[in-house]
Amino acid sequence: MTGFELYLKANTRAFDRYLSTFFTDGTHPDMGRYLYGPLKQFSDNSGKRHRPLICLLACEAVGGDPKQAWPAAAAVEHFHTAALVHDDIEDSSLTRRDEPCMHIAEGLGIAINAGDLALALVCGTVVHDPGLDDPTKIRVLAELVDMTTRTIEGQALDIGWARDGRFDLTVDDYLTMANHKTAFYSGGVPLAIGAIIGGGSTAQVETLRAFGMAAGLAFQIQDDVLNLVGTRESTKKDFRSDIAEGKRTLVAIHALQHADRRERLLEILSTHSDDPVLLDEAVEIMQAADSIAFARDYAHDLIVEAKACLVDAVPASRARDLLASMADFFVKRSS
């Protein structure tokens, strides 16, 4: 295990306990059944908690007390939960991490409503944080609002291109979409918020943000790669669903620009079939065009860029070492 993985393992359980305090039964017993219970169950199964935990690391890296950043870190995780609930609906996904998606298990209406509550918790958690002064709250809230807006903009590109059957896209188009959809909330903003709460300088906040944006984009590219070449068991997601859904990933866009069998790949991506034979054929075309290798190399270069930012941002410390380990983990993980 990397240092960052050990850090996640050591801290996830305590953070999970803290998150559970947000999922009460509300003002009526049935709210637990129809709202807070489903949301808690989904949140409990929503991943490694790297987003909130890197927020704490950023706070520590600039000399702050990471305990002060717990509510803001929880706000980031609430957003992640909301984004996943709504994303599963928009993508018509069936499972997430070996469990039925909320809209499958509880129904579409319950899932939309629970996702909306998670969004409300994002700002509410910070507003009601007794440990932050008002100027800091305003800065953190501004970051969260911008993060939410950018992520929704990225999702609009992703689902809009799919709806309109758009494959006339460039690598730069993909990078814009992925930066908005993933990098802001998976790296850039959690780190900026942690640095703000920790009392970091403007230069530290912005350099940690840049580190997080590069690492967050690499995280998304690695997700794209794992969806194609991992295994259903290791990814714990809908394996090769990106092909079945005709997703405009970096791999797909590169292959459509360079593959000898471009028209055949375009045909497969446009059929929205989950036939394993067709999925295998699409991956073979992508591999022959060196598109998967291109994506891996691009993600690796982003991590080199990210780690260079980190050295400039904060002095040597345990927290800085763990953030560097995080960047490596983002592109070496298998799920």
Task: Identify the residue ranges that each predicted region occupies.
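Mobile late-domain/C-terminal helix-loop "cap" segments
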Residues: 259, 263-312
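A non-catalytic, amphipathic alpha-helix used as a structural packing/dimerization or gating element
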Residues: 10, 14, 143, 189, ...
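Non-transmembrane, amphipathic alpha-helical segments
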Residues: 3-7, 42, 110, 174-179, ...
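N-terminal amphipathic/basic leader segments beginning at the initiator methionine
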Residues: 1-26
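An amphipathic alpha-helix signature
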Residues: 16, 20, 56, 119, ...
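Hydrophobic, well-ordered secondary-structure elements that form the walls
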Residues: 252, 306, 323
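Short, amphipathic C-terminal "tail helix"
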Residues: 302, 314-335
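Mg2+-dependent prenyl diphosphate-binding active-site environment of isoprenoid biosynthetic enzymes
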Residues: 28-264, 328-331
